[in-house]
UniProtKB/Swiss-Prot annotation:
Keywords: Chaperone, Cytoplasm. It comes from the Archaea. Gene3D superfamilies: 1.10.287.370. The keyword Transmembrane helix does not apply. It is found in: Cytoplasm. Heterohexamer of two alpha and four beta subunits. One of its GO terms (molecular function) is protein folding chaperone. Belongs to the prefoldin subunit beta family. The keyword Cytoplasm applies. This is Prefoldin subunit beta. It comes from Pyrococcus furiosus (strain ATCC 43587 / DSM 3638 / JCM 8422 / Vc1).
Amino acid sequence: MQNIPPQVQAMLGQLESYQQQLQLVIQQKQKVQADLNEAKKALEEIEKLTDDAVIYKTVGTLIVKTTKEKALQELKEKVETLEVRLNALNRQEQKINEKIKELTQKIQAALRPPTAG
């Protein structure tokens, strides 16, 4: 890195930072997607039950009885919240990818040898 100009070194540092941010966003996205899939599956199963079915849910370390109606409402809200979060993470991932692409182009241009005109 001795031959690399300081401004390019700074850009490389920024690029590394963006890549780390991207990794974190991707990990968060995977977690939210898994939670969303799980919530949708639970919603499907509860919708199959009769209205008077006995349903239990976990609350912290407890398991408590609930109604089908309450369980459906809570799961629908959870799915909606997770979908909003997933959309936000998708936008964030896209913005970071754009920054990475832009910065990579700047770095490549800065390292390109000047052409004799």
